[in-house]
Structure formats: structure tokens, C-alpha cells
Amino acid sequence: MNLNIRGIINYSLLPISGIFYLVSVFRKWLYRVNFFKVQKFKYPVIVVGNITVGGTGKTPIVIALAQYFKQQGKQVGIVSRGYGGAHHQGSLLVNKDTNVYLSGDEPLLIALQTDLPVMINKNRAKAVKDLINQCQVDLIISDDGLQHYKMDRDVEIVVIDGIKRFGNGFFLPLGPLRESITRLKSVDFVINNAGLCAGEFSVKLTLKMFVNVKTGEEKSLNYFKGKYCHGVAGIGHPERFFNALIRLGINLEHHIFADHYIYQQSDLVFEDNHPILMTAKDCVKCTQFENDQMWYLQVEADLSDDFLKKLDAKL
């Protein structure tokens, strides 16, 4: 795009960005002064969110936290908005048998990897209430929802992109911000997904293995080294996934889809018969396809002992 045209477009978005900022501040203030009612709960709620749009790796952290507390004997439940799913009315309890087209990819992925109840509702406060009423839980983790102030919370965790940070520092739609950077001063923990800054905790996303989408067969990280493969990603920042595959020595052809994209089998039909590599988030939308050349990269979030110790103390 011509730089002058881009500059004009950016300049025209500045007032909208300013309005978004004012609305964000005013809306939060209305909850602070109790103009809007905050829904409180009898069990602690941990929110894992961010102040920017786009993927920052929240879901692997939610899964890691859920598994950590589950191992401690907690009865954990998760709530989510259910982005990309067709379910829009009321709450839906997601389990491993739920249709991904109803739930969206992230809630189903969390349910599959944790074997814990996941309740989706665009009203997260209602999701928490229904989760408590329908399931035996004593700790709730909210996948995203930092800006859903109607839902009371005991711990706020913000995940930030350690490379992109806060982009150009502007609010939507001119920049990536949903809330001011100063919001970080009021949260309990900031987790950096790439690198480390003062006052932030690091998380290590560890590549584990490749798993066949159809058969569950497992292969080591070196299995596709030197081979030609198709890389498929419908996530917030696909370049991270592609770069990880390239670092494994894979000759990769990139195929980028929109975040939360619902795949059709025709999307994954290529002229050659090279393996198709995808994320776990993409995998849950492709299990019904008749293609044994699809593999997903299993990734785990490793949270620091220092972070977990301080989180336990907060609860």
C-alpha cells in the first residue's frame, strides 16, 4: 500500500481509537463505582487474559494451570467465550464429545487436554454461575475475560507477547490495545511468552512431539527434518508456529487461515501427498477428515516454580 494512503487511513482511524480508549476507561469506572453490578462467586476465579488483540498463548497457560491445580486435588472448571463456535444462546457445557462447530476450537481443546468441565457463554459471569451449579468445582479459570468486569475475580493474570509487546501503543482499531498499558499495574501477574522483563514472569512453550490427527501415532520432533511438508495454521500469530517448524529443519509451505477458521476437507487437499502439520487448536477441527497425513505439534506451557508459589499464596 502506498505510504501516503496508509498514513491517511491511519490518521482517519485516530479519532475512533481515541473513542475506544475513552469508552474503555469509562466502562471500567462504571463498574468501580458500582453503577454496574459485579457478580461475585463463592469459589475463587482466576482470569487469564491480555490487553491486546491477537494470540498471546493464553490457552496453553490455561491448560497448564488447570492441570497444576487438578494435580493438587482441586476441582477445577474453566469458562470461555467460545469464539468461533455456533452456540450463542445461554451456556453450553463442553466435553470431549462436543461438536467443535458448536463450542469453538479453544474450549474443546481445553476440555480434551484437561478432562475438566468447560462452560461457554458470551456472558462469562453467567458461565461461572452455571458451571458452579452444574458441576462439582471449587476453582474456576477464565480463558480470556480480563475486560469482562461483570465477572468478579480473585486473581488476574495477563499474558503479553514478549516480541511484539504492545505494537504501536494505540487502541483499536489503529493499534492492538484493548486497555491501557497502565492496566498492567493493577493485575496480579504478568506472564511474558518470549523473553523476560522486570516484574514479569516467563513461560516456556516446550515442543513435545508430533501426533497423528487420525491415529494418535506419535513421532519425535526430528521425524520430519529435511522433509517437505505443508504447514497449516488458523491462529492469532501463525508465524510463531511456522518458525518453530522451520527451526526443526522442515521444508515448509505455508497455508494461513483466519483465527478460529472452521476447516472444510477441501482446504487440506493438496496436489502432492506431503505431510500436513498443524497446531493442536487446528487439529480439533480436522479429526473428521479422511486424511492420515495430518499431524499436530504438541506443545506444553512450563510455568516457573516462583510464579506457581506466588499464585498459590494469592489463593
UniProtKB/Swiss-Prot annotation:
ATP binds at T52, V53, G54, G55, T56, G57, K58, T59. Pfam families: LpxK. It is an enzyme of class 2 (transferase). It catalyses: a lipid A disaccharide + ATP = a lipid IVA + ADP + H(+). Its EC number is 2.7.1.130. GO terms for cellular component: plasma membrane. GO terms for molecular function: ATP binding; tetraacyldisaccharide 4'-kinase activity. Keywords: ATP-binding, Kinase, Lipid A biosynthesis, Lipid biosynthesis, Lipid metabolism, Nucleotide-binding, Transferase. The keyword DNA-binding does not apply. HAMAP family: LpxK. Transfers the gamma-phosphate of ATP to the 4'-position of a tetraacyldisaccharide 1-phosphate intermediate (termed DS-1-P) to form tetraacyldisaccharide 1,4'-bis-phosphate (lipid IVA). This is Tetraacyldisaccharide 4'-kinase.
